[in-house]
Amino acid sequence: MMKAVARSRQWQRWVCSSCLSQRAVPAHQRRRFSNSPKSAAVEFEPIIPASHAPPLYRDEDNTLRSVFDYPRFWREFSSHPGGVSVGLFRNAYLKEPRGFLTFARVSLKKARAVVSKVLAASSVQEYRAIVRDLDRLSDILCRVLDMADFVRVTHPDRNMQRMASMAWDMVYQYMNELNTMTGLHDQLAAAMANSDVTAVWSEEEKTVAEVLKLDFTKSAVNLPKKYRDRFVELSSEISAVGSAFVQEMAPDQDVIVLPSSDLRGMDPLQARELTRGGKVHLPTMSGQAALALRTVHDADARKLIYYASRTASRRSVELLEHLMRLRAELATLSGFESYGHLALRDRMMARSPEAVDKFLRALAENNRPKAMQEMAELLAEKRKAYPAVKRLDPWDKDYYSDLIRRPLRLTGRQGDLLSPYFSLGVVMQGLSRLFTDLYGIRLVPKQPVVGETWHPDVRRLDVMSDTEGHVAVLYCDLFYRPDKSPNPAHFTVRCSREISEAEMAEVWQQSKQDPDVPPFASPEYAANDGMTFSRQPNKTIKQLPTIALVCDFPQPSGHGEQQPALLSFFQVETLFHEMGHAIHSVLARTSFQTVSGTRCATDLAELPSTLMEYFAADASVLGQFARHYETNDPLPYRMVAQKVRQARRFEASDTENQIILAMLDQALHSPRAAQPDFDSTEIFHGLQRTYGSAPPDPPGTRWQGFFGHLSGYGSTYYSYLFDRVLAQRVWEVVFKSGDRGAALRRENGERLKESLLKWGGGRDPWKCLAEVLGDERLAEGGEEAMALVGSWGSTRQN
């Protein structure tokens, strides 16, 4: 019925082109594929406007910069007289680690009460409430799961992590029981079949009902008990094998040993660090090996490195193929033709593997001429040294690409010239100003209270609307710490949801009777576990989206911490990308948590974040905030344009790689996985030969054994390509590619918000796209709509 949808999954990225020669590690260890906007290639110096903030907001705007850029200011701003802890995120249960277990126990009591209510429903009135009741049940469980999921990977206190993991396990086990509970499925089906019930449901309620119904179907709840038991066994085995595949993936050859003379062209300092007894010992799956493929002059040396870095161990491939076969069995058990058919039925715009195939083929056709042109450029570059050669070898691509890119690259001191214009506080100012222009919301620093945050470096920002007041809470843990993951991440710690008066009264009564429940000041706080809420104009109560952003930007430095944290342009893109997820959570404040925020179609979830990367490189947007931290001089935009041009070089070839990987994902989750002669290596090499312009991998290699994304994103890897195309289309159609300040116009932001962002997953995403793009061909979705999107392409014209 409901799943432990880890909202942290949004930070997972696909395999960027620079990583294709390395081991594919878990998706959360990957940065997204580079995606820079068309307008960024235009060289001009924009007029730098003053802040658009009204006088009332200018103090907030200045404070926003100061809390991130000036440590002394932050220490004074965040200081408090002490007192009793209010609990992590102001959750009254989480004042100490063992509070997590109490939180889980109380939540399970609430959940069982809701289950009993749903199972007892018999009247039309009771059936009308079933969707709301099941959504509340999901929210009760996800409050624990999402909070615990965040804490166990981010909190610096190991004991807190341990208790969070225990709480997560308690609730997840109960959720698995619910997923195979036939009574809940039957009651939902009865409600959906009764026209007197559905006649009063809103569009959002009907969408939630369909989502919950699909969740039940995918859990095999409608099957006889022995098949349900096998379903549970298979699910457990798939989880174990998937984890083993990711954790044990390894190359066939761990180290490549070469004479040091063979590595001419490589950074001599790095080569020297790896040299022992006149031989270079190069770890196969390392940054140094990837660097060698780009810079070593000797083609034979590059060939050895290429073979080693593209050949996974036989054990890795065996685990991969075992995982695919188990998924195929699970799909058959559940009544689906393949795992791809099973996976794409739930919260996916594509809806079927056939539609994904239409999209990928159309995209490949659009991209192929540009990819072939890029390969011709590489061959021409190779012929400068070897005039008689007729073809490129697989180990040539990175080397000659790097040769062509070098003149475009900002090198030496030039590479550091962008960072002084991007202090972290200034970038946060820019984001707030952009959101004010587009959506009428702003980021306001809020003094944290005792126990609210997990580290003194964490800043709390309240998201304020010009018309609706307080709409979300954003916690920013953006500075490097030794105990932190280096991966940028967005977590939805709590979703938006409307809370009824009856629910508040019930929880308030429980708080007075259950000794495990801490004291609360009011029914509203009791219903929100002490966390922040808002009262709507119609007097209803909504739990506010609570979001955490985690990055690893440098700490302020210099004498007396006078130099703020300065970001590279890459880090600016990263922050804009993650804030795109956050703004989706903020704007999609639905009445039901099942469809709130980023709980939309999986292949739509990356659209808002990918779109934000276009804003990060737009001249008018940068003109609003990018100034030198010492001189206050405006950013020379030509420097950004040069950076973008370098990143876009060989973009079509990079896209082609992604298309082939998405096709591989589809093929491995097709009915072929259940056949006796299933061979993942043959499938991968066949796709390269059929759809690749670049030279395919040579026989003997097995790169697919490094494709860790196959574990977590089975049959949905195409989503990143899909959202790249959609983001580019929205940028061009809605924001006019940033022309004449279109990226800052309120009417354009309102169009995006009202047509798409505010709905979360509560409306058919194809209807949202058709409305925002003004293209009715998309309204019904299906295979032809997927093919149409693919035909638009994702590689910008020069």
Annotate each predicted stretch with a short phrase.
Residues 203-204, 208-210, 225, 232, ...:
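Active-site-proximal, well-structured secondary-structure segments within enzyme catalytic domains
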Residues 108-198, 656-699, 712, 739:
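C-terminal non-catalytic alpha-helical accessory regions
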Residues 1-63:
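N-terminal mitochondrial targeting presequence
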Residues 321, 328, 335, 435, ...:
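Active-site recognition of the HExxH zinc-binding catalytic motif
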Residues 44-111, 149, 153-351, 456-458, ...:
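His/Asp/Glu-rich acidic catalytic environments and adjacent acidic regulatory segments
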